[in-house]
């Protein structure tokens, strides 16, 4: 749908929605950075630590939030979800800031995760629906820049406030609370998604016709015409995320093992990785993906193949790590992550767009959580080389699937893409897309 605010990707509607990614990345990094401090303060057991990790914004709570948020965004509107999610998020942050026991801390982590998951699905959807058809990649790229910025800022704040102990980590979370409240103020003043309004207004105006398209269910997404799109996107994104999940949580450890660097240097390398991610989005994906999408995807996806191959070479040390963060940063910025956001917003009809993204986000985060249980065992028993070989297979498979089956959607409106893939909305009804609410 065309954007009445102009073609600039950095307009209020896009930035307000893109801040979801800043908050997502910031929550994950802040939670990870402060974990050891909370363990010391509350004398947490291994079971309690495991619960915090499993139910954090990087795992189960975010997955469940995405599932709920996706359904609600299709049912009641994108704005209702992505606006109110900020208030829920603020509640979760306050529980962390004022937490004096484990139940308060765990509740805060869960609420943060639920709100982040719901926010991501609604925000990604509204960005694509409000973007001009010729510049959709540029607009979606703003969200990926925000993700990298969130990670870098939180890492930097964590380093600067490190000497303050737990208070320093609370300052980091407090900064996220401020961002969330600013985001809420921005969003409450903005209109609903054009595409969602267009879909629903005619149905309300024609009372004699049943509002069949408004009755959505996750079971509808199991129909062959939608399932094949989900399988394609999971082949690209979920498989790639098996590597990305390891990179996000275990890379500082791998840096120390392969490069022999200190813990502080490992954190600096991780910050460098996020910086190159932002550069990959801003300098490669945003300027070129609207016109040369498959080429951009292929080159950026191949960067991940190069990156994980480096750990199979008989060479170790800091130079290998520096080359790794450059090529993986480019991949993170212009490869599977950014293209997934774009494709997932394009290839589903309006009435299922957010639900489909919620379902896939759920599957990805749950899969990462399960996979992460086995990663330490593989590294300990078989070595980093074996893990690198497995992840090399994942990113290679993801690249091949993307190159073979990527849809031709560049420069087309969402309505045109929907009609090419599924026919007109009327024909969808005739095919039996009407269903009961989940």
UniProtKB/Swiss-Prot annotation:
Q: Does the keyword Transmembrane apply?
A: yes
Q: Which GO terms describe its cellular component?
A: membrane; plasma membrane
Q: Which family does the entry's similarity section mention?
A: Belongs to the major facilitator superfamily. Sugar transporter (TC 2.A.1.1) family.
By its UniProt entry, which PANTHER family does this protein fall under? CARBOXYLIC ACID TRANSPORTER PROTEIN HOMOLOG
Name the SUPFAM superfamilies on file.
Answer: MFS general substrate transporter
Q: Give the source species.
A: Bacillus subtilis (strain 168)
Which key words tag this protein in UniProt? Cell membrane, Membrane, Transmembrane, Transmembrane helix, Transport
Q: Where in the cell is it found?
A: Cell membrane
Say what the protein does: Minor myo-inositol uptake transporter.
- Membrane topology annotation: Multi-pass membrane protein
Gene Ontology process terms (BP): transmembrane transport
UniProt miscellaneous comment: The growth-defect caused by the iolF inactivation was only observed in the iolT-null background.
For this entry, the protein name equals Minor myo-inositol transporter IolF
> What top-level branch of life does the organism fall under?
Bacteria
Molecular functions per Gene Ontology = transmembrane transporter activity
Per the record, the pathway is: Polyol metabolism; myo-inositol degradation into acetyl-CoA
Which stretches are transmembrane? 15-35, 49-69, 86-106, 108-128, 147-167, 171-191, 230-250, 268-288, 295-312, 317-334, 359-379, 387-407
């Amino acid at each position: 749908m065309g954007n009445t605010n102009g073609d600039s990707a950095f307009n209020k509607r896009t930035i307000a929605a893109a801040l979801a990614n800043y908050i997502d990345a910031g929550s994950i990094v802040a939670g990870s950075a402060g974990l050891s401090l909370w363990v010391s303060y509350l004398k947490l057991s291994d079971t309690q630590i495991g619960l915090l990790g499993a139910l954090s914004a990087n795992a189960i709570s975010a997955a469940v939030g995405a599932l709920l948020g996706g359904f609600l965004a299709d049912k009641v509107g994108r704005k209702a979800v992505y606006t109110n999610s900020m208030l829920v998020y603020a509640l979760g942050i306050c529980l962390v800031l004022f937490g004096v026991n484990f139940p308060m801390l765990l509740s805060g982590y869960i609420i943060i995760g639920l709100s982040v998951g719901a926010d991501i699905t609604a925000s990604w959807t509204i960005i694509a629906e409000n973007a001009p058809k010729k510049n959709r990649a540029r607009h979606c790229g703003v969200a990926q820049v925000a993700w990298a910025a969130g990670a870098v800022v939180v890492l930097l704040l964590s380093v600067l406030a490190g000497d303050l102990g737990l208070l320093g980590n609370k300052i980091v979370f407090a900064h996220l609370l401020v961002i969330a409240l600013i985001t809420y103020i921005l969003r409450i003043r903005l209109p609903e998604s054009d595409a969602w309004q267009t879909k629903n207004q005619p149905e309300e105006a024609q009372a004699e016709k049943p509002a069949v398209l408004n009755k959505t269910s996750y079971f509808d997404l199991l129909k062959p015409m939608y399932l094949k799109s989900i399988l394609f996107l999971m082949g690209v994104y979920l498989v790639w995320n098996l590597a990305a999940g390891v990179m996000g949580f275990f890379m500082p450890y791998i840096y120390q093992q392969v490069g022999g660097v200190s813990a502080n240097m490992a954190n600096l390398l991780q910050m460098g990785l996020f910086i190159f991610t932002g550069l990959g989005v801003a300098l490669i994906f945003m300027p070129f993906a609207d016109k040369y999408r498959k080429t951009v995807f292929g080159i950026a996806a191949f960067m991940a193949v190069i990156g994980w191959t480096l750990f199979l070479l008989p060479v170790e040390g800091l130079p290998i790590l520096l080359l790794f963060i450059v090529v993986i940063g480019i991949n993170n910025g212009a490869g599977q992550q950014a293209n997934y956001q774009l494709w997932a917003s394009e290839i589903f009809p309006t009435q299922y767009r957010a639900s489909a993204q919620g379902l896939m986000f759920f599957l990805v985060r749950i899969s990462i959580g399960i996979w992460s249980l086995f990663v330490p065992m593989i590294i300990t028993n078989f070595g980093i080389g074996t893990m690198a070989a497995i992840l090399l297979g994942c990113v290679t498979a993801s690249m091949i699937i993307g190159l073979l089956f990527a849809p031709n959607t560049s420069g087309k409106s969402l309505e045109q893409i929907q009609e090419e893939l599924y026919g007109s909305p009327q024909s969808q009804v005739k095919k039996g897309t009407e269903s009961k609410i989940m």
